[in-house]
């Protein structure tokens, strides 16, 4: 069966919290996964040790297990791909648009 790296939603209404899990592709979103390899909190929070007041979203991930599952053929969903690229495991799937190069035209 095909394995997926995907998000399983927990938390409450208007306060989502996700587990990054390895599960079979055809199982339900919150069914029992094969392994939980990390968590993702999409609600921006202030860092307790940062005095600038910047907000950040919390991503905790077992990098060695994520690399293992990708190595054995687990396919990340688009959202998990984006999170793994933020951590530095995968290259970004969608690159930011580059500014257009101005073409010099001869008159």
UniProtKB/Swiss-Prot annotation:
It comes from the Eukaryota. SUPFAM superfamilies: Ribosomal protein S16. The keyword Zinc-finger does not apply. It is found in: Mitochondrion. Gene3D superfamilies: 3.30.1320.10. The keyword Lyase does not apply. InterPro entries: Ribosomal_bS16, Ribosomal_bS16_CS, Ribosomal_bS16_dom_sf. It holds the Pfam family Ribosomal_S16. GO terms for molecular function: structural constituent of ribosome. Keywords: Mitochondrion, Ribonucleoprotein, Ribosomal protein. GO terms for biological process: translation. Component of the mitochondrial small ribosomal subunit (mt-SSU). Mature N.crassa 74S mitochondrial ribosomes consist of a small (37S) and a large (54S) subunit. The 37S small subunit contains a 16S ribosomal RNA (16S mt-rRNA) and 32 different proteins. The 54S large subunit contains a 23S rRNA (23S mt-rRNA) and 42 different proteins. Component of the mitochondrial ribosome (mitoribosome), a dedicated translation machinery responsible for the synthesis of mitochondrial genome-encoded proteins, including at least some of the essential transmembrane subunits of the mitochondrial respiratory chain. The mitoribosomes are attached to the mitochondrial inner membrane and translation products are cotranslationally integrated into the membrane. This is Small ribosomal subunit protein bS16m. The lineage of its organism: Eukaryota, Fungi, Dikarya, Ascomycota, Pezizomycotina.
């Amino acid at each position: 069966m095909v394995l997926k790296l995907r998000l399983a939603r927990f938390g409450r209404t208007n306060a989502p919290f996700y587990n990054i899990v390895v599960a079979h592709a055809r199982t339900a979103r919150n069914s029992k996964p094969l392994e939980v390899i990390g968590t993702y909190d999409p609600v921006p929070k202030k860092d307790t040790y940062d005095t600038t007041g910047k907000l950040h979203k919390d991503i905790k991930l077992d990098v060695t297990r994520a690399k293992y599952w990708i190595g054995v053929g687990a396919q990340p969903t688009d959202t998990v791909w984006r999170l793994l690229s933020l951590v530095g495991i995968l290259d970004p799937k969608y690159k930011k648009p580059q500014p257009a190069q101005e073409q010099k035209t001869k008159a």
